[in-house]
Every structure is written in structure tokens, then in C-alpha cells.
Amino acid sequence: MSIIKNFFIGLILVSTLFAGQDLESAKIRLKDKEWDKAEEFLLKALNHPKDKWEAAFHLADKIYPRSQDWDKVKQYMDIASTASANTKIRPTANDRKILMSQAIAASLTKSYNLLYYRATGFLSLLNRVSDVDKRDALVDQAIDTSLQAKELDPLQPGSYAMLGLYYSIKGDKDNAFKYIDQALALPDVPQDVQLALLVSAGQSAV
């Protein structure tokens, strides 16, 4: 029994000894823009209870948006969001400490906007393409991008509006109306956005 007990005590001591070191090493790599090394140390830091929330935030905020791995962005931001309400973090080395919840909200907005504006960009591409197969492929890409934005921040009406629009272009009126209805059901949707959604619904019905 004493051998097993000493083994677990040893594991705890080793874990305590290295707690913080992986996170600090990751921050140095982030500052130097050594993204692969930073990812490696951040993933290690996830194993330290005191560091896991900050490590998860940096993975979701700085590492996986670069590779456009939006599933991992959401996965690690969900982990970061389990931090206690009074947890504070410096989003970057030059920032003052703010609540983790504020840092998460700002980061998600940044990633959402990137996806949303990419989704809207497909409209100009569609206007320049006449080939049916190419248009269909672009519409599918636009829908996928809009869905990624919606999954990342389900409370933003813009991604639902884009889904309604692109499904309407695709000729799928059921899905077009579904996403417009979902957007209108979101809390605190501004009146001008509601009006735009209703206009879009009218166009989809034609």
C-alpha cells in the first residue's frame, strides 16, 4: 500500500512542479509566433488543473483559427468557459487582465466575424460565375461557412440570414424559411435586422 501511495504522491509532486511551466513556455512561443511549438506546450498545459482554462483559451483564440479548424475552436473555447466566474486572463501579453468571460466573448466575436464576412464574400463570387456546377459548388461552400459561423456563435442572427439566403439561391425553400424563422426567434434582434430577415423571407417565397 505504501508503495502505491508514494507513487501517487510522486505523481502529484511532479504535476505540481511542472504546473505553469508549460503555459509560460507556450506564451513565449506565442509571442515569437512559433505556432506549432505553442500548440504543443498549450496541449500539455491542459493537463494542469490551474492552467487548463487559460491554455484552452489560447488554443481557441490563437492556434486553431489560424488553421481554420473551427470545431477545435469551439471545443477549446467550451473548456475555457468552464472557468469560475471570477477567473481573469490576459488575452495577449500586452493586454490588461480581464474576466475570462469577456475574453471569450471578444474572441468568439472575432472568429465569428471572420466566418461571417467570408460567407458574405461568396455573393460577389456567384455574381461572376455562370457555370451551373461551379455556382452550385460555391453555394455549398457558402452554406458550410455560414453553418460554421452559426455553430461558433448561435446567438448572432447574421449567419442565419446567410443560410436563409444561400438556401434560397439553392432552391431549398424549406431550409431557407427554417433559418430565417430561427433568426427571428433569437433574443434581442434589432428591428432593422428583423425587417431585413422578413424581406429575405418574402424573396425566398417567390
Where are these regions (language model features)?
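Single-residue signature of alpha-solenoid repeat helices
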Residues: 38, 72-73, 135, 142, ...
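Residue-level detector of the short coil/turn that links helix A to helix B
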Residues: 33, 67-68, 137, 171
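Sec-dependent N-terminal signal peptides
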Residues: 4-15
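Conserved structural position within tetratricopeptide repeats
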Residues: 43-47, 81-82, 89, 144-151, ...
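TPR/TPR-like (Sel1-like) alpha-helical repeat modules
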Residues: 61-89, 181-186
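Amphipathic alpha-helical repeat scaffolds of TPR domains
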Residues: 20-21, 27, 51-65, 90-129, ...
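Alpha-helical solenoid repeat scaffolds, predominantly canonical TPR units
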Residues: 29, 41, 75-79, 83, ...
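N-terminal, post-signal-peptide region of Sec/Tat-exported proteins
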Residues: 36-76
